[in-house]
Amino acid sequence: MPRKGPAPKHTVVVDPVYGSPLVTALVNKVLLSGKKSVAERIVYGALEGAKNKTGNDPVVTLKRALDNVKPTLEVRSRRVGGATYQVPVEVRAGRSTTLALRWIVGYSRARREKTMTERLMNELIDASNGLGASVKRREDTHKMAESNKAFAHYRW
């Protein structure tokens, strides 16, 4: 066990274009092989495209998409007496945001549009409207937690 206490939390730098820490977090999730300028171009292009397509503020669209994708419950494996149970637990706020961003970017990469900018834009628009694969992932996660509610007393 470390004796120095908990590690200090990292402060997220505010995005220079939109002034939102969520945009910075999205850029960092899109980032591959340290190419931050490429990731910024993809994210800014997707947000501009979402603004042109929906007519709404892109940061509002991003927040609405995240709210529709953030899970409130998830299952964690817990081993009790030789059997492994899927125990439903509540998700902390920071983890739910991280999971939502991870799912949005992951399902954007799996889409069939030509460029990553288009894929991310369409996934954000779909998620903000309550559609898309990332929203389905959240529903599946909640369904799994609901079906394993009988093991909730194993929570730690």
Curated annotation (Swiss-Prot):
GO biological process terms held by the UniProt record: translation
UniProt-listed Gene3D superfamilies: Ribosomal protein S7 domain
Record's protein name: Small ribosomal subunit protein uS7
Gene for this chain: rpsG
Domain of life of the source: Bacteria
Function: One of the primary rRNA binding proteins, it binds directly to 16S rRNA where it nucleates assembly of the head domain of the 30S subunit. Is located at the subunit interface close to the decoding center, probably blocks exit of the E-site tRNA.
PANTHER family recorded: RIBOSOMAL PROTEIN S7 (PTHR11205)
NCBIfam families: rpsG_bact (TIGR01029)
Keyword rRNA-binding: yes
